[in-house]
Amino acid sequence: MAIELHDLKPAPGAHKAKTRVGRGEGSKGKTAGRGTKGTGARKNVPEFFAGGQMPIHMQAPKLGGFHNPFRTEYQVVNLDKVEALFPKGGKITVDDLVSVGAVRDNELVKVLGTGELTVKVDLVVDAWSKSAQEKIEKAGGSVTKR
């Protein structure tokens, strides 16, 4: 005998009817599982209420400070990394740094002066530190803004 579409029914216990409270003395009637008297019996208690103990939002410290929404953030590249990635030197742009995986695309790049530079590099970046500029110029190179 083949199963027809109208013969299908859910497994026993798959669809359990929800308890309808407050619908007569025999089944969770009268107080409907809320107990007698008090806030919980009369109205709903806020979800964040912790039973009279110190609320969680008051346990957390009051952090001060200021977050500047207009701060410009740079991806940094140090001179030792520039020399490691470009041992022959030459002209280096942000696109070159992106292609070797030193920085991400479409973001500002700043060169910092950690490490030594022995090759001549002509960097085209968004920003640089004073120490980086001194070391680059000492090695015979230059830094220009893109």
Curated annotation (Swiss-Prot):
Region called Disordered, residue ranges: 1-46
UniProt keyword list: Ribonucleoprotein, Ribosomal protein, RNA-binding, rRNA-binding
TM spans (from-to): none
Pfam families tied to this protein: Ribosomal_L27A
One GO biological process term: translation
Superkingdom assignment: Bacteria
Family: Belongs to the universal ribosomal protein uL15 family.
Function: Binds to the 23S rRNA.
PANTHER family linked: 50S RIBOSOMAL PROTEIN L15, LARGE RIBOSOMAL SUBUNIT PROTEIN UL15M
Self-association and partners: Part of the 50S ribosomal subunit.
Protein name, per record: Large ribosomal subunit protein uL15
Lineage: Bacteria, Bacillati, Actinomycetota, Actinomycetes, Propionibacteriales
